[in-house]
Curated annotation (Swiss-Prot):
This is Probable nicotinate-nucleotide adenylyltransferase. The gene is nadD. One of its GO terms (biological process) is NAD biosynthetic process. InterPro entries: Cyt_trans-like, NadD/NMNAT, Rossmann-like_a/b/a_fold. Catalyzes the reversible adenylation of nicotinate mononucleotide (NaMN) to nicotinic acid adenine dinucleotide (NaAD). Its EC number is 2.7.7.18.
Length: 209
């Protein structure tokens, strides 16, 4: 199987996560996209709601959209969530599958600061959600890696890992921070959240301060 993986805090999960993942799945003809909530992100100290609540919200999205599947491997780990550790565990248990880790451009630009980042290329392809008109600067610290590994979506056959695949996606002016701010002010961002997530947040009285 060809499986995309979208990791994130998902605090809360919203259309800014969902829509780009759907576009990536369609462009690459993936069988599934796993939504993988982090438990203890190395670069974040806390989240606004519990891990269990973020898992439940992510599961609601998977229930509504059949192309998604919940991956709880990081959320259930009682240690910092380093991607390379997670991918080693996943590829060991799914040796015949091809994995595509989905990230934004900001993550790509800081990739060389990630724990054992060069090992990622032996475990998966990296899909970069690309804003219109963007290109990587030659001054970037990962430019040489990018140049040697970048491929267009229609030229990725024959390799199970190691490529960087930029995919133009529709810009989404949505952020979890802004959603939390709106909710704390009593505003329900109906255009940013699926109905089931809105209902869950209201039922659990989340993000209200």
């Amino acid at each position: 199987m060809r499986i995309g993986i979208l990791g994130g805090t998902f605090d809360p999960i919203h259309f800014g996560h969902i829509r780009p993942a759907q576009e990536v799945k369609q462009t690459l003809n993936l069988d599934k996209v796993w939504l993988m909530p982090n438990h203890i992100p190395p670069h974040k100290t806390s989240t606004s709601v519990s891990t269990e609540q973020r898992l439940e919200m992510t599961q609601l999205v998977c229930d509504e959209y059949s192309e998604f599947e919940l991956c709880a491997i990081e959320a259930k780990r009682e240690a910092p969530s380093y991607l390379v550790t997670t991918l080693k565990q996943i590829t060991n248990s799914h040796p015949n599958d091809e994995f595509f880790f989905i990230m934004g451009m900001d993550s790509l630009l800081s990739l060389d600061t990630w724990f054992e980042w060069q090992s990622l290329f032996g475990l998966c392809h990296i899909v970069v959600c690309q804003r219109p008109g963007w290109s990587l600067s030659p001054d970037s610290s990962i430019f040489s890696q990018y140049q040697s590994r970048v491929r267009s979506p229609n030229k990725i056959t024959g390799k199970q890992s190691g490529l960087i695949i930029p995919i133009p996606v529709t810009p989404q002016a949505i952020s979890s921070t802004h959603i939390r701010e709106q909710l704390s002010e009593g505003i329900t961002p109906t255009n940013a959240l699926p109905d089931k997530i809105i209902q869950y947040i209201e039922d659990k009285n989340l993000y209200r301060t």
